[in-house]
């Protein structure tokens, strides 16, 4: 089974449980918080990924670490993921879970990537425009990519809107190559 399939299977199972318990949003918040803690601390991440640590010890540690900090659904889910040695997939499971919640709520996930933060006003304007084009509510996350020269990229569902300077330069280059302008034509 591929990484993508594994994370989808676990995310779908959690989604079904959360839907039955009418706790889609709270389950997402709890899972997001725990994944953030697990993957922000190198010691915790290495512990759960280490082949040297006994699997039953990892499971007990996971159960104790989420006890009282998460609902029964999320606590049992984290314990199951650790028991099945799927800890590495938790970030992907979270993303697939979010996508599932978005589908159920007729919502799209919008990711804006830019060199620097665009600011609230620009993000709101982009959100409003995309929301009206797609006819659904949009959940926005903003990321920075220092490799961008300027501009931004928007990822929504399976679409990419590339308004980066690099894309514009590539388009200009391609147009010039298509016209086959001879060298020295602008002298």
Curated annotation (Swiss-Prot):
It comes from the Bacteria. The keyword Cell inner membrane applies. It is found in: Cell inner membrane. It is a peripheral membrane protein. Its main location: membrane. PANTHER family: ATP SYNTHASE DELTA CHAIN. This is ATP synthase subunit delta. It comes from Leptospira biflexa serovar Patoc (strain Patoc 1 / ATCC 23582 / Paris). The gene is atpH.
């Amino acid at each position: 089974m591929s990484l993508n399939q594994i994370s989808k299977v676990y995310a779908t199972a959690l989604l079904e449980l959360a839907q039955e318990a009418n706790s889609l949003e709270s389950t997402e918040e709890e899972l997001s918080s725990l994944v953030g803690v697990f993957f922000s601390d190198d010691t915790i991440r290495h512990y759960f990924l280490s082949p040297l640590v006994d699997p039953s010890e990892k499971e007990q540690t996971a159960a104790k670490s989420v006890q009282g900090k998460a609902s029964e659904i999320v606590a049992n889910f984290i314990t199951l993921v650790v028991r099945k040695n799927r800890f590495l997939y938790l970030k992907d499971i979270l993303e697939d879970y979010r996508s599932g919640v978005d589908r159920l709520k007729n919502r799209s996930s919008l990711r804006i990537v830019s060199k620097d933060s665009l600011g609230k006003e620009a993000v709101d304007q982009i959100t409003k425009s995309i929301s009206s084009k797609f006819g659904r509510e949009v959940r926005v996350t903003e990321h920075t990519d220092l490799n961008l020269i300027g501009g931004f990229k928007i990822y929504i569902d399976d679409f990419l809107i590339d308004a980066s300077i690099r894309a514009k330069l590539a388009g200009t280059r391609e147009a010039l190559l298509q016209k086959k302008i001879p060298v020295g034509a602008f002298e």
